[in-house]
A protein has these predicted regions:
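Short, structured surface patches at the beginning of a domain
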Residues: 1-133
Length: 133
């Protein structure tokens, strides 16, 4: 599939620690480095980082998460890369809604930890079908 060169690769990470401790900073820096490395290794163009620190995965009002949704809905994103799926959402229904948004806007989801690329994985097909029945 040919990607539009003007579209971004959204690199999203979230740290739920509310403190500004050294551990939180290390976790954030580590996630960002892994996302950047993954994007580079997979030839994903125009990386843009979206990060939420100190927010629960059940909270869909996270500032960077809302910005991510806005650029997805504006068809400015070709790929979303996360370290693991729980960084996006911890709630089943919120995760399903996000996957439907990604599918509607032809965005490829990459999860490094789960080794997932795309929405054609069996787990996603089942999840996307769940709300239709």
């Amino acid at each position: 599939m040919i990607r539009q060169s003007y579209k971004i690769t959204a690199l999203y990470y979230r740290i739920d620690h509310s403190s500004h401790s050294a551990m939180s900073a290390f976790c954030a820096q580590n996630q960002q480095k892994r996302l950047m490395f993954y994007a580079r290794e997979h030839g994903l163009q125009n990386p843009k980082v979206f990060s939420d620190c100190g927010y629960s995965g059940n909270n869909t009002s996270r500032p960077a998460y809302r910005k991510l949704l806005a650029v997805i809905r504006a068809d400015e994103v070709s790929d979303v890369v996360v370290y693991e799926l729980s960084r996006l959402n911890r709630d089943f229904e919120n995760q399903r809604r996000l996957l439907l948004e990604l599918k509607a806007h032809n965005v490829t989801l990459h999860s490094i930890q789960e080794q997932i690329i795309g929405l054609d994985e069996p787990v996603f097909r089942a999840l996307l079908k769940e709300g239709c029945e």
